[in-house]
Amino acid sequence: AYAEALQADVADHQLGAESDFGAGRIYALQGGVDQASWQVLEQIGSVLEPLGIAVDKINGGPGPDIGPMAEKGMPWAELAQDGTDYFDYHHTANDTLDKIDPKALDQQVAAYAVLAYLAAETDVDMQPKPKAQP
């Protein structure tokens, strides 16, 4: 619904991201951006590196919530999480905040704060990865 309602405003989105895979530690920064925007993601990655997060230019994809906007041309980034125990807790009686490792949550919050702030502050107008030619 969001993508349909804001279809004309896709270009106004600097970078889309979401966290929708549990509470595991983030291990990689991935993205669907053009080459100039990748330079920004690599700079962001250098800030994220002390948190144990590597830049991964090969893998990843937009999450299910931002996917419709990415399909319409929004640049996206993914902070890929360790989902090893995701289905042990997700939508079970044990899906409660006390099951989350506080250090993993701290790392996630720091990573998203860095990503959001630095993506917003760059002078680069982030652009999506060009679509592959048939």
Positions of PLM-derived features:
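His/Asp/Glu-rich mid-to-C-terminal helical/loop segments that flank catalytic regions of hydrolases
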Residues: Y86-P134
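Structural recognition of the beta-strand scaffold that forms the well-ordered cores
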Residues: Q14-S19, I58, P68, P75-A80, ...
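Stable alpha-helical elements in mature extracytoplasmic
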Residues: Y2, S37-V47, P62-D65, L105-A111, ...
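Sec-exported extracytoplasmic/periplasmic mature domains
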Residues: E4-A8, S46-I53, E71-M74, D95-D98, ...
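Second-shell loop/turn segments in exported
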Residues: I26-Q35, A54-N59, D95-L105
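Acidic/histidine-rich catalytic neighborhood of metal-dependent amide-processing enzymes
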Residues: A1-V40
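Short catalytic/ligand-gating loop segments at beta-alpha or beta-beta junctions
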Residues: P50-D65, P130
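Solvent-exposed loop/turn segments at secondary-structure junctions
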Residues: F21-R25, G61-P62, D82-F87
